[in-house]
Amino acid sequence: TAPKPIDTEANLGVMNAENVNIVVHGHDPSLSEMICEYADSKEMIDYAKSMGAKGITVSGVCCTSNEVAMRRGIPMAGNFLQQENVVLTGACEAIVVDVQCIFPALGPLSKCFHTKFITTSPICQMPDSDFIEFDAGTAGEKAKQIVKLACENFKNRKPELVHIPDLKHKATVGYSVEAIVKTLDGVTNSQVDETGTTKPLLECITSGVI
């Protein structure tokens, strides 16, 4: 689906101490979309509850975070520089990565906690990770496997190591070209102009109104 204006939250405080926390990180939106799809399914939520959690929280890091935020309102745990911090909360059951922007330290760092560091691309396998290859043909099957693995890892969490900062901020995201053009259609005179263009905005700029 195309991005649209939607409310979300950002910073490490979006992680939930009572839920299974899955963090998606990287640049492949097809992976993060499928993770979100299955994490939101009744089957997986019930499975998480059977493991002792109250539900499942998916949050994002880096560019993947922006993709799922502006399409689904998925909260943003942090930017590129905060990827290690989500593990340091002690509440991350799985951090799922794809092709780039991945700190090599995530592997050994995750071993200091209970976090599953899951790599999914053959070109980006890393030490101290669980490799689950993701491709379009088996996307649903592999996403479900990853979500299930995260749920099963909830029982391995060490409560004494959990520290989620009480810090998060509200945000409205999703101002894509499509969303902006749709808004501009509302001020377009369809009797004399075509809809679906940025002409109203351009006219405001060229006339000096903006």
Where are these regions (language model features)?
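Metallocofactor- and cofactor-centric catalytic cores in central/energy metabolism, strongly enriched
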Residues: 1-210
